């Protein structure tokens, strides 16, 4: 079975849309998680808050589309059906990767660290709170399940 990259990208985009919605829902309930904001402040001056959020949200959704394509390409190459059970495993691996990268990328981020407006997250966001590693993993598992469920549904009807 050949991967359909357009459907994979759309599925990843929708998965990232759901992930972003859940991030801001958690933020509304007092959790200090705002991954799109971290992405935005990497490229836009922190004083331009509306521009930060606009660019960050768009970039986060495009990154999600890229991850959707990567999921489908790798699963198809492994001759595994891209469906929701595979989404659980790939989402977990994705969450581990993102959690590790947050700590590494923070070292070069212009607004993260001591004497900067954003506190350093540490590996898996541990420095942002006790629940943060669980949120990062859980949200990316949800992303994987949503992305691959949409892809599988779209192809099989």
Region roles according to the model:
Residues 1-157:
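Juxtamembrane/disordered regions of integral membrane proteins
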């Amino acid at each position: 079975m050949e991967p359909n990259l357009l459907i994979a990208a759309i599925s990843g985009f929708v998965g990232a849309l759901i992930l972003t919605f859940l991030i801001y829902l958690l933020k509304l309930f007092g959790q200090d998680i705002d991954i799109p904001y971290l992405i935005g402040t990497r490229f836009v001056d922190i004083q331009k808050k509306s521009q930060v959020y606009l660019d960050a949200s768009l970039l986060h959704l495009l990154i999600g589309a890229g991850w959707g394509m990567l999921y489908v390409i790798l699963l198809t190459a492994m001759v595994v059906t891209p469906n929701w059970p595979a989404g659980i495993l790939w989402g977990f691996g994705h969450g581990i990767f993102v959690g590790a990268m947050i700590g590494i990328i923070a070292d070069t981020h212009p607004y993260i660290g001591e004497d900067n407006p954003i506190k350093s997250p540490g590996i898996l966001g541990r420095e942002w709170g006790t629940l943060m590693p669980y949120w990062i993993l859980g949200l990316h598992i949800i992303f994987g399940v949503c992305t691959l469920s949409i892809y599988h549904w779209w192809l099989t009807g």
